[in-house]
Structure formats: C-alpha cells, structure tokens
Amino acid sequence: MNAALATTTATTPVLRRETPLLHYCSLTTKSPVYQINRVRFGSCVQTVSKKFLKISASSQSASAAVNVTADASIPKEMKAWVYSDYGGVDVLKLESNIVVPEIKEDQVLIKVVAAALNPVDAKRRQGKFKATDSPLPTVPGYDVAGVVVKVGSAVKDLKEGDEVYANVSEKALEGPKQFGSLAEYTAVEEKLLALKPKNIDFAQAAGLPLAIETADEGLVRTEFSAGKSILVLNGAGGVGSLVIQLAKHVYGASKVAATASTEKLELVRSLGADLAIDYTKENIEDLPDKYDVVFDAIGMCDKAVKVIKEGGKVVALTGAVTPPGFRFVVTSNGDVLKKLNPYIESGKVKPVVDPKGPFPFSRVADAFSYLETNHATGKVVVYPIP
C-alpha cells in the first residue's frame, strides 16, 4: 500500500493491474453509462490528485504487561527473520546473529514486542518491487509495536520507556527499510511514531499502522465528510475493516455498506456497516443505491465505478493506472496515528486481528503462508517477539 498522487483530467477510463499501490480517482459523469468492457463512460471526467499518502472485533488478546525496561542492556546481535533472495515463503530464514541496528540522530531504537504482516510484505519478498527495493538481505516487516530503549540526539518528544507503534518505512516501495519490524530490535524515525493507545495491547497496536493510515488517507483524498455514503469492498480485510469504522465513527457517514463472505457479515455489521452484502450471493452492480465513495480494497474497480453517484469517487488498493490516471505511493506519518489515537482510546475504532493469530515469532513463515491465502480477517499479527 503506497501512494504518489497526481492531478489530471481526461475522458478515458482509469484501468488497473495488480499492485499494492493505492489509487484514487474522482469520477464525474453527466450520464452514468459505465460499460467497462467497451470503455464507454458516458460523459466522464476522472481526476487523480497528487500528494503523498499514509499507508489495516477483537484479537486473541496478548498480555498487556510486557517486561521491557528502557535501561536494559542492548545486545550487539539479535534474532530476526531474513531473506537473501526473492521468492516464496521458503526464502525466509530465522537468524540469531543479526547486528542490532545503529540509530541516526532522528531515530529511536525500539525493542519490538509485536509486528504485523501486510500484502505488500509478501509482494516485496516475491521481488515484485525489486527496482525500488532496498538491497538484499532484507529483514521484512512494516508494522511494529514496542518499547523505546534508545533515542537519537535530535529526538524531541519520545523518551526511553515509551510504548510506541508505527509503520517503520516512510515509503513502502521506494527504498523501504532494509531492516524492518520482524526482528527483536528496529530503528525508526521519530516522525513516523506515535504513542501506543493505552487501551489496547501490543499485538492489537501492531495491526493498525499501515492499514489505518491507508484507510484514513483514502477518506481524506476523496473529501469524505459527514452525511456522505460509502461502499467498502472487502470490509473484513485489514484495510476495509478500518475504513468502515473511520467512515462511520470518525467522519460521520450517513450510510456505510460493506461486502464480506457469509461468515463475516456479522463482523462488518459490528464494525459499523449499515448494510452487509454477501459477495458470494449478491452482485454489487445490482445494488439499488449509488454511493458517494466506493473504497475498493479487493481489486474490483471495474464494478466499483458502476455503483458510484454522479460526481462520486473511487479509491482502489490494487491495480495500476494507464494515463491519465496516476499511482500514488502511501507514506508513513506518525501524525495520522496521533490524530486517530483518541478514537482508538475511546473504543470508537478497534483493531481487528485475525483469530488464527497472533502467530509466535518462530512461526513467521506460517504467518506469511496464511496471509497469502487471501482469507485473513483483519490483520495477521506476530506476537510475542522475544
């Protein structure tokens, strides 16, 4: 999930291919004629704004009491999951002699307590972004929750002992960190971090950063506001589950509809969906209502554009764009987490952690295998990390 927004106007459709980039297009139509196969859009104007984005029920509870002290002796070496070649899950190796990263003046060193996996982790490991990736070998992982054990000289607000969470790579695909969160320690810039919400544990916190930043930025870029309606495709996924909650409980949506499989309909209702749609039985193109925004978190943009109102907007998590559309790379920003912390602490927004987890640190390869089935509910979390 990533983003680099650009603004353009044209009368041809935006098409997409599979990619973890987040896309945004504003569709304004005088006559809503949408026949994707024939590329006939009536009178259609598509806008893609340019800007960097930030790129997500209850979990099996991890203990909130974590015995980490700020003045603990920091070892020279640590355990970490590493891959030295691109490929399948089998390239992942648990190493015990990885050097603990040195911090820069604007960074803190975090003793990692929990981490989470995202689809972009798998695609990166498969080599789909090798042109812009950091050099191998790689310690994967974007999402982290843990305790600050060392601070750089230019760090202003954080101190040793603070419990924090973040997406550790400012840009998920453009030179992401070589040493990510699937390790005992990781170095993170202060600007990417926020204090962990007090009411959730580390495992729950680890499941939030990349997904909730993606969800929020999509809503911001579509100018979503009180009184508007939204349809979320894949409402039980890591990002979709948070889009439902933010739209309903933070932005004041007049109506939230969401698709899910039969067994997950009650979950999306519990998160705030007014209408839960069983995608195994219903076709969204046949829905009687149109929506101000469609948030496509599954890769069905061709159908998404058929259920928006005149002037409505679509956010797509998968697919690339042919001109005049533009991809935009989601970037991490601790300010987004700080903005949303009050809603998390009030219980209005809840982390959704897949019930098959958390996976212990020794089973990271199994966690990836499960993630790549594309059947996870919410986020796949790794906890505890020794």
Curated annotation (Swiss-Prot):
GO cellular component, one term: chloroplast
GO biological process, one term: response to cold
Presence of the UniProt keyword Lipid biosynthesis in the record: no
Name of protein: NADPH-dependent alkenal/one oxidoreductase, chloroplastic
Keyword line: Chloroplast, NAD, Oxidoreductase, Plastid, Transit peptide
Gene name of the encoded protein: AOR
Stated family: Belongs to the zinc-containing alcohol dehydrogenase family. Quinone oxidoreductase subfamily.
Effect of loss of the gene: No visible phenotype under normal conditions, but enhanced susceptibility to methyl viologen.
Activity sensitivity to pH: Optimum pH is 6.0-6.5.
Origin: domain of life: Eukaryota
Presence of keyword Nucleus: no
Pfam families in the record: ADH_N (PF08240), ADH_zinc_N_2 (PF13602)
Location(s) in or outside the cell: Plastid, Chloroplast
Principal subcellular localization: plastid
Protein function: Reduces the double bond in short-chain unsaturated carbonyls. Acts preferentially on alpha,beta-unsaturated ketones rather on alpha,beta-unsaturated aldehydes. Has no activity with (E)-2-hexenal and (E)-2-pentenal. Contributes to detoxify stromal reactive carbonyls produced under oxidative stress.
Single annotated GO MF: 2-alkenal reductase (NADPH) activity
EC number(s) recorded for this UniProt protein: 1.3.1.-
